């Protein structure tokens, strides 16, 4: 398997055709997996926002004040409001805001980016990353006559470990996971619980070569990845009612009476 960055992608602006930009910079193949940073998808969709466009609610004011008190970190109430607007549910309000986006991703600050956003204060995540992955895949087929798989990616922190890693927000052309259950290990024991989050692992591999900051590039290609003869699943996010961690967070508060 080979993973390489797509170099030379220009600064993306609202209305740009992401698929066309990628095809111009990379000789793509049918079996490739194209990993595209959510930032350029959002830029192309005009998801940049100004803080001045947000009028903070009472809840946003309270959350911002609580974060400032607990974390000794100034939090603009308008930023808190932007996060609330992008969340279906807020699980933690302080010392940071952890929420469930409207497409099911759980992340800090609703994944809102404040870096590399020319002409705006904030960059929101795509509204429907899977639909965007499908559109990019269709566009690549239209422009280049090939049909690789596409993953829209982001970087995200994780509990219990330091550091960020690449994750999949949306995907098209491949299953989210592959199921090893029913197969056997080297000692002949049947595997009972091994479901591999393929799209997340590919997103993380892509993140190793795309980099961060002003030296980064917003796309990478995974070539010669073999999914194998396994059952696949489109489900990546846990069922909220069976997610023990989510249920615990719903009951937990940093602020004690």
UniProtKB/Swiss-Prot annotation:
InterPro entries: F420-0_g-glutamyl_ligase, F420-0_gamma-glut_ligase-dom, F420_ligase_CofE_arc. Catalyzes the GTP-dependent successive addition of two or more gamma-linked L-glutamates to the L-lactyl phosphodiester of 7,8-didemethyl-8-hydroxy-5-deazariboflavin (F420-0) to form coenzyme F420-0-glutamyl-glutamate (F420-2) or polyglutamated F420 derivatives. HAMAP family: F420_ligase_CofE. GO terms for biological process: F420-0 metabolic process. Its EC number is 6.3.2.31, 6.3.2.34. Coiled coil: none annotated. The gene is cofE. This is Coenzyme F420:L-glutamate ligase. A divalent metal cation 2 binds at residues 155, 212. A divalent metal cation 1 binds at residues 113, 154. It comes from the Archaea.
């Amino acid at each position: 398997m080979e993973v390489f960055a797509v170099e030379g992608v220009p600064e993306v602006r609202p209305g740009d055709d992401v698929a066309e930009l990628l095809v111009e910079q990379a000789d793509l193949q049918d079996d490739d997996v194209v990993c595209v940073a959510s930032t350029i998808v959002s830029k192309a969709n005009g998801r940049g926002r100004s803080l001045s466009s947000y009028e903070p609610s009472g809840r946003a004011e309270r959350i911002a004040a609580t974060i400032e008190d607990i974390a000794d970190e100034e939090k603009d109430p308008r930023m808190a409001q932007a996060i609330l607007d992008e969340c279906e549910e807020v699980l933690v309000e302080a010392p940071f805001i952890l929420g469930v986006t409207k497409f099911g991703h759980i992340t800090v600050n609703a994944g809102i980016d404040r870096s590399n956003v020319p002409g705006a204060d904030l960059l929101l995540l795509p509204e429907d990353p899977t639909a965007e992955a499908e559109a990019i895949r269709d566009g690549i087929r239209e422009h280049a006559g090939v049909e690789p798989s596409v993953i829209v990616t982001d970087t995200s922190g994780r509990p219990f470990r330091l550091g960020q890693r690449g994750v999949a927000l949306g995907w098209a052309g491949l299953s989210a996971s592959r199921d090893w259950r029913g197969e056997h290990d080297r000692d002949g024991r049947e595997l009972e619980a091994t479901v591999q989050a393929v799209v997340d692992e590919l997103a993380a591999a892509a993140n190793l070569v795309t980099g961060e900051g002003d030296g980064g590039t917003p796309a990478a290609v995974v070539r010669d990845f073999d999914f194998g003869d396994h059952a696949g699943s489109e489900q990546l996010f846990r069922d909220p009612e069976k997610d023990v961690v989510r249920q615990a967070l719903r009951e937990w508060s940093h602020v004690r009476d």
